[in-house]
């Protein structure tokens, strides 16, 4: 399908792209496309390394004492349930 594209067809496609997007926006679009490709490549590499790490990890059953400690939920700083009610501000200015 693409084997039949010659130089005139490619030039025509490039001219249409320049007319559609404008010459000023093309460098920014190419830069963002490059960043997206780089991010996609790094994410794919990270997924492969995670898969290799999961395969290399031993499949021992979890220790019951250890799993109970992992399930403990700690309160977040500024947790609403443990905070005191806010008092109304006193009016310090005189009218």
UniProtKB/Swiss-Prot annotation:
Keywords: Cell membrane, Membrane, Protein transport, Translocation, Transmembrane, Transmembrane helix, Transport. It comes from Streptomyces coelicolor (strain ATCC BAA-471 / A3(2) / M145). It is found in: Cell membrane. InterPro entries: TatA/B/E, TatA/E. This is Sec-independent protein translocase protein TatA. GO terms for biological process: protein transport by the Tat complex. The chain crosses the membrane at residues 1-21. Coiled coil: none annotated. One of its GO terms (cellular component) is TAT protein transport complex. Pfam families: TatA_B_E. The gene is tatA. GO terms for molecular function: protein transmembrane transporter activity. Its main location: membrane.
């Amino acid at each position: 399908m693409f084997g039949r594209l010659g130089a005139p067809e490619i030039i025509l496609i490039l001219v249409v792209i320049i007319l559609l997007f404008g010459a000023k926006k093309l460098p920014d679009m190419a830069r963002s496309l490059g960043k997206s490709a780089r991010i996609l490549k790094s994410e794919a590499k990270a997924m492969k390394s995670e898969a290799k790490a999961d395969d290399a990890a031993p499949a021992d059953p979890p220790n019951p004492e250890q799993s109970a400690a992992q399930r403990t939920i700690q309160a977040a700083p500024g947790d609403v349930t443990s905070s005191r009610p806010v008092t109304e501000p006193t009016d310090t200015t005189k009218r």
